[in-house]
Design a protein with these regions (language model features):
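N-terminal catalytic scaffold of extracellular/periplasmic and nuclease hydrolases
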Residues: 1-86, 92-94, 101
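Binuclear metal-dependent hydrolase catalytic cores centered on His/Asp/Glu-rich metal-binding motifs
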Residues: 19-32, 65-66, 129-179, 199, ...
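Active-site neighborhood of phospho(di)ester-bond hydrolases with catalytic His/Asp-centered motifs
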Residues: 10-12, 44-49, 78-88, 111-116, ...
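Active-site environment of divalent metal-dependent phosphoester hydrolases
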Residues: 17-19, 52-55, 88-102, 119-124, ...
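Conserved beta-sheet core of the metallophosphoesterase superfamily
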Residues: 79-82, 195-256
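Short acidic, glycine-rich surface-loop motifs adjacent to enzyme active sites
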Residues: 41-52, 169-192
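Active-site-proximal segments of metal-dependent phosphoesterases and phosphodiesterases across multiple
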Residues: 55-76, 178-210
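A short C-terminal boundary segment appended to hydrolase-like catalytic domains
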Residues: 249-251, 255-389
């Protein structure tokens, strides 16, 4: 097997609708430096948030995402040849949208993974030959919004289907040196992963994966390295994605392009910061976000309560934006919202579990986060708490 360096670039979230509708026509959508970074890799993996499918009779809302199939021309310019579609918008346009996306990918000699017409198809790994000892990838999506595929129905590979995930990882490791899990999950707009998300991703490493690359929060989060050389990148943030509801939140206009460099024996990475220029709808380079740093277990334990408090502040902003008449200027209504677990996104011990998040956030009053040595990370999180502390 060839032991020379083999590289893959992973982007953040991509959706050519809302403010990005039609932007695929602009050949200067991305700066030259971004194109150079993308083109420097052997493969480019994008997180495609929505179907390439646009019939006129679809009912569209703030949270609905589907794209004009013509947007594929922008993906070609990026040399994005692998599309991660195991996310909470891949099924917004139903099975027809999913099939359309996969058909367009095949016509453009691109691969898709993470969603399919059945559980078997959704869980099918992508294999990248024998370079660097061989690389295989799967993609998983969180409950409830990533509609889970079954033996006979279309959807995503559910991130809690541990038996199937472990089996696919084992299948990859039989023939490949490296296994990558793309994970679409975690709370939106949170600066750090909640403990149960972090534990789940570490669980994938224990199953045999070497790297986890995360999406869905729409903001960049930290990464974490381990003594055995394995890595988790909790969220790359947005790349080509801009909506009204996201503009209500901090840090949704920045993200990270991640390049993983493989040889048969070693894994390294490079990162490029990107910024969505909302005045003209283009994407440029910027400094790598301060939050995108290696936060080991001891520092995470110090910072997790402050990050949980910041997440609650962001979730409050979200609820006020979505339903201003119910939550705007009404602290009692917000108190009721955060004291219960009856909302539609709740999954016990896995997603939006306020029975876990609220007590963790309340622990921030102990000020142990002030003992963290990561001053820039603390400032990044505190920005979310303007007016809250």
């Amino acid at each position: 097997m060839d032991d020379k360096k083999f590289s893959i670039v992973f982007t953040g979230d991509v959706a050519f609708d809302k403010y990005m509708d039609g932007r695929w026509e602009d050949e200067k959508l991305l700066s030259g430096e971004i194109y150079d970074f993308l083109h420097s890799a052997d493969h480019v993996v994008i997180n495609l948030e929505g179907a390439l499918y646009q019939p006129s009779d679809l009912v569209k809302t703030d949270y609905f995402h589907a794209m004009n199939p013509e947007a594929v021309c922008a993906l070609r310019r990026m040399k994005a040849d692998i599309w991660s579609i195991g996310n909470n918008h891949s099924m917004d346009a139903g099975k027809e949208g999913l099939v359309s996306t996969k058909t367009i990918a095949k016509a453009n000699r691109c691969k898709t993974f993470g969603a399919g017409r059945s559980e078997a198809e959704a869980s099918q790994p992508v294999f990248l030959g024998e370079q660097a000892g061989g690389i295989g990838m799967i993609c998983v999506g969180y409950q409830k919004e990533c509609a889970a595929a079954t033996a006979h129905t279309a959807g995503c590979l559910a991130w809690d289907n541990d038996k199937l995930i472990a089996g696919r990882i084992k299948e990859i490791k039989k023939t490949c040196r490296w296994c990558i899990v793309i994970a679409h999950g975690g709370e939106e707009f949170s600066p750090l992963p909640l403990p149960y998300t972090r534990e789940r991703y570490i669980g994938y490493l224990k199953m045999g994966a070497d790297v986890v690359v995360g999406h869905h929060p729409h903001v960049p989060e930290n990464y974490e390295t381990f003594e055995d050389g394995k890595m988790i990148f909790y969220s790359l943030g947005n790349f080509i994605f801009d909506t009204d509801y996201q503009r209500a939140h901090f840090y949704t206009d920045i993200g990270v392009l991640l390049k993983l460099n493989f040889t048969k024996d070693h894994l390294t990475f490079e990162a490029m910061g990107i910024k969505i220029l909302r005045d003209n709808g283009s994407i440029s380079t910027c400094a790598v976000p301060d939050i995108f740093t290696d936060i080991l277990a001891n520092e995470y334990q110090l910072l997790a309560p402050l990050a949980a408090k910041a997440f609650l502040a962001e979730d409050k902003r979200k609820m006020i934006y979505l339903n201003p008449s119910k939550y705007g200027g009404k602290p009692e209504a917000l108190k009721d919202y955060f004291s219960g677990c009856s909302h539609e996104d709740y999954v016990k011990g896995s997603h939006m579990d306020f029975d876990i998040i609220v007590p963790l956030a309340q622990a921030a009053i102990n000020n142990e986060w002030q003992n963290s040595k990561l001053s820039k990370v603390k400032q990044h999180i505190l920005t979310l708490l303007r007016g809250e502390i």
